[in-house]
Structure formats: C-alpha cells, structure tokens
C-alpha cells in the first residue's frame, strides 16, 4: 500500500507532495551551505581552509538551491498540485512519466553530493567554465559527477516540461480557451516551453565538456582548435532562460495571491499579464551574452545585448504595475501570504533595478564578478523566487494538508525572514561598488564591516528557517481543520474542499457559457 502510493505513484497530488518534501530537504542542505559561506566571510582570515573547498561549497549551494529547491518546489510541487485542479483535469497527461520526473531527482542529488565527496570536489562555480573545469585544473571524478548530476536533473525537467505543455494544451474542458486559464497555469506553461528549448543546449555543452575531459576532444581547448568562449555561449543560452524559469512560476503565484487577498475576482490586466510573461519568455532567449560583457565582444554586439536586456524591463514593469493595480481599491486582507506577496513586489523591483544597472555593458565591465552581481541576483532569487514560494506555501497549505498555519507565527516568520535577507544582501551592493570580487574565501580588511553585517543577516534568516519548521509542526500537531473557502468561483482549485479527494474531476468539469 505505502509503496504503491509513494514509490509507484501516478497521482499528481502525491507526486506534488513528494516534490515539496524533497525540495524542503534540499532547501535545508542549500541553507546549510549558504551559512558555511557566510561564516567563512563573517570576518577576514580563513575558516574552512583554502579557496578550493570554499568554491566547492559555493558551487554546491548554487546547484542545490536552483535544481533541487526552487525548481522542484515551484514547478514540481505547486505545478503538479495546482495545474490539473485549476484547469479541471483529472490528472497530468502522462502520470507515469510524472513519477519518473520526480524519481530522477534523488539520484541526481546523490551524484551532486558525491562530487563533493571524491577528490577535491568541483570548485568551478555553478557555470562550470573550462579550462578551470577541464581535466588539468580539476583532475579526478568530481566535475564528471557534477555533469552527470546535471544530465539527470535536465532529463527530469525536460520530461516534466513535455508533461505540463501537453496537460495544459490538451486537458482543458472543451468549452474554455487558453485565455480563460488562470495566470499560474500560463506561467507554468511558458516555463515549460523555456525548459524544453534551453535544457538541450546545456546538455550539449556539458556533454562536450565531458568528452573534452575524458575522450581527448578539444571543443573548448584552443590547442586543438577549440574555444572556451563557445562553452560560455552554450551555457548562458541555457543559463539566462533558466533564471526566468526560476521566477516565472513565482509571477503566477503572486498574481493569484494578490488577487485573492485584495478581494478581487480577477487580476488587473489579465491579457497584459499573459503577453508580458510570453514576452519575458521570448526575450529571455536573446540576451544571454550580457553575462559575457567582459570576454571581449565587438562593440556592436555589446550595444545589442545591452538594449535587448533593457527591453525586458518593460514587460516586467507591466507585471509589477498590474499587481499594484490589482491591489488598488481592493478590500485588502493582511494575511501572511499577502505580506509575502507585497514583500516580493517591493524586493523583486529593487533586484530589477540593479539588473538595469548591470545591463549597461560599460558599467558591467567594472561590476562583473563583484558582489554587486551577487546582491542583484539574490534580490531576485532569495527575495523573489523564495518569497513567492513562501507566499504560495502559506496560501495553499490548507489546500495541500487540510490544516491551517498559525497566523501570528506566520507573520513573525515573515518579519524575521524579511529583516534577515535584507540585512544579508543589501550591504553586498556596497561591497560590489567598492570592488570586492566574488568567489574568494578571504578579503582585505577594508571590507570587514559590511561582510560582518551581511553574515549576521544570514544567521537571522537561519532562525526564520528554523521557525518555519516549528510552524509546520505546530499546524500538524494542532489540527485546525478548514471549514470553508471563500471565492471558489474564481479559484477553481478550492472547490473540492481541503484537502481535495485523491481523485478529482473524474468527470469533465461543466462550464457555464455565461462566463
């Protein structure tokens, strides 16, 4: 019974739950690694050892947070749980493939951890650039294990993407068009398209790196007519869409949360929101070289990538102002989920502004590989993606479990987290402007003050993570059941009660034509 339900599951709700639990545990690992980083940087001098072990920790922190925390929770967890419920489908289009997508992740995670355990570990940064990732600078199996880990995670995501695209296009009730599906469904579909188009390029790049390392090919070795810059193009053609993959489902969740707690029946500017997401998805593929402004590209190339990158601010602005317009005139309920959503809008916008700064190729020459870049992407990830996950979690927790979280604890948790992440990452803008480089385990004494404050902030965030564990325990221990949910007419996922039955929509949903 237990094995049939959890190991061989074909139920989108159970698989979504598995993704959530896996992502939560991976998030603990990623948090631990981030605490190691900030402990090392809390004061000048050495704590862990040399830069190799430090860079192994930094690399693992990135991979764990991206591939095993944010993506499994947002796409695998929320996506699996909510998409079929929101479109009135009985399950995903390919339920067994769905199960395989999940079970590819634990082996992938194991391979990543194994890469740290053998030889000296993969101290390459998450970009895995050759020649540092070649078989001279990184002799041994570490980088190879990392590459295999990425292959498995990539296959998992590609299969998941195929599944979501098929489900969303094919399993709606015949009466409704794509433009009547909720924004979260749209966000997952666009994310899936991005995954489907970008991951094969990453797979090609890291496979070439694998053969360069082991089979004596020279794709990225100038001695044999190769070019390490080719690797950078291949990696970033995946890497830039990837950062939009990490944030787009968050956009979808924030739209739902803001609409719900503003007491509105629909988000402001639905079509504008959809087109904005599609524009972001398209533009995300044609700006990749802004990560490479320092490798010596032609001035006209730099001009193009600068302007193209700035254009992405327009659809992003459409989304931000539409969220504000949704709030406008609403009967606002200051629930914990709403606090996360408001925090998201504010902090994501700050991250977007520093992104506009970095898009200037001339400025980026100075700021590239400094802590300014670290501050920028942690504002959009640690306060964008993670805030969206937390908001979605506290909003849909009653749907997933049937129990309610304690409102007061949830608000305290938000406050601690808000203070912690801002104290961690705001000072890093100053460090970057002062020229402190990334990926070094030590620094000149001049940078001590802001680094110490930053490290203190990370420990505040750690207490927030611990409080969250307590909060979830408290909810399950207290067993406060959900009586009823308001606004189900425009929030289809809630109509089956909390939690919904094992099988939902066994008959096709009936859609009234008046809507």
UniProtKB/Swiss-Prot annotation:
Positions contributing to heme a3 binding: 376
Reactions performed catalytically: 4 Fe(II)-[cytochrome c] + O2 + 8 H(+)(in) = 4 Fe(III)-[cytochrome c] + 2 H2O + 4 H(+)(out)
Gene name, Swiss-Prot/TrEMBL: MT-CO1
Binding site residues for Fe(II)-heme a: 61, 378
Primary role: Component of the cytochrome c oxidase, the last enzyme in the mitochondrial electron transport chain which drives oxidative phosphorylation. The respiratory chain contains 3 multisubunit complexes succinate dehydrogenase (complex II, CII), ubiquinol-cytochrome c oxidoreductase (cytochrome b-c1 complex, complex III, CIII) and cytochrome c oxidase (complex IV, CIV), that cooperate to transfer electrons derived from NADH and succinate to molecular oxygen, creating an electrochemical gradient over the inner membrane that drives transmembrane transport and the ATP synthase.
Residues given in the record as Mg(2+) binding sites: 368-369
Cofactor annotation remark: Binds 2 heme A groups non-covalently per subunit.
Molecular function terms, GO-annotated: cytochrome-c oxidase activity; heme binding; metal ion binding
Cofactor: heme; Cu cation
Mitochondrial matrix side: 1-11, 87-94, 171-182, 262-269, 328-335, 401-406, 479-515
GO BP of this protein: electron transport coupled proton transport; mitochondrial electron transport, cytochrome c to oxygen
Native source organism of the sequence: Heterogeomys hispidus (Hispid pocket gopher)
PANTHER family per the UniProt record, alphabetical: CYTOCHROME C OXIDASE SUBUNIT 1
UniProt EC number: 7.1.1.9
Pathway: Energy metabolism; oxidative phosphorylation
Keywords: Calcium, Copper, Electron transport, Heme, Iron, Magnesium, Membrane, Metal-binding, Mitochondrion, Mitochondrion inner membrane, Respiratory chain, Sodium, Translocase, Transmembrane, Transmembrane helix, Transport
Cross-link 1'-histidyl-3'-tyrosine (His-Tyr), sequence positions: 240-244
Assembly and interaction partners: Component of the cytochrome c oxidase (complex IV, CIV), a multisubunit enzyme composed of 14 subunits. The complex is composed of a catalytic core of 3 subunits MT-CO1, MT-CO2 and MT-CO3, encoded in the mitochondrial DNA, and 11 supernumerary subunits COX4I, COX5A, COX5B, COX6A, COX6B, COX6C, COX7A, COX7B, COX7C, COX8 and NDUFA4, which are encoded in the nuclear genome.
Protein name: Cytochrome c oxidase subunit 1
Record topology, Mitochondrial intermembrane segments: 41-50, 118-140, 213-227, 287-298, 358-370, 434-446
